[in-house]
Regions:
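A Zn2+-metalloprotease active-site environment signal
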Residues: 1-182
Length: 182
């Protein structure tokens, strides 16, 4: 399932110059202004948003909570203070990156969503390549699986019939639309 129709999605722009985006349970997607500015075009931004929605539709946060609950149950059997384990679980959820499998799954879901909505799917791996080739890669990429491997996987997933799409790649139109905000 690429889209969960039972969820009301909420998108928030965070005034932060760091290049980052993240999703939480309940359909909340947060995109930093730094990421919006770093994108060359609408399709690149759509790729990031599609990836974050992929985490929601993949129920990745729910899996992390289930794992924490299992760990808490095991700790009770071992006589560890449950309050201490809950605190550790919250800290782990906030600081550890999504699993490698979750990232690949969110990439696949995001790329598929891009193709279904008409955006040029090439923008997703191109944005990742742009970010890792910059002066300093964004912090969120350093906590994700090997980006070069993800780029290669994304490029392989794009069907030949979609490789020449240009929808959403107009950089000047994108930058013009941002002028009133930034």
């Amino acid at each position: 399932m690429l889209f969960r129709s039972n969820i009301k999605y909420t998108f928030q722009v965070v005034e932060d110059e760091n290049i980052n985006a993240f999703a939480t349970m309940g359909g909340f997607v947060y995109v930093n202004t730094g990421l919006i500015k770093a994108a060359d075009n609408e399709a690149q931004l759509a790729g990031v948003i599609g990836h974050e929605i992929g985490h929601i539709t993949g129920r990745h946060s729910i899996q992390h909570i289930k794992q924490a609950a299992i760990a808490q149950g095991a700790s009770s059997l071992l006589g560890v203070d449950p309050d201490q384990i809950v605190q550790i679980g919250v800290q782990v959820a906030l600081t550890l990156p999504n699993s490698r499998q979750d990232e690949y799954d969110a990439d696949r879901r995001g790329l598929t969503t891009m193709m279904q909505t008409g955006y040029a799917p090439s923008a997703m791996p191109e944005f990742m390549k742009k970010l890792i080739s910059g002066k300093s890669a964004p912090e969120f990429l350093s906590s994700h699986p090997a980006v070069t491997e993800r780029v290669a996987n994304l490029q392989r997933m794009i069907p030949a019939s979609y490789r020449n799409r240009t929808d959403g790649l107009n950089a000047s139109s994108y930058k013009q639309s941002l002028r009133s905000f930034f």
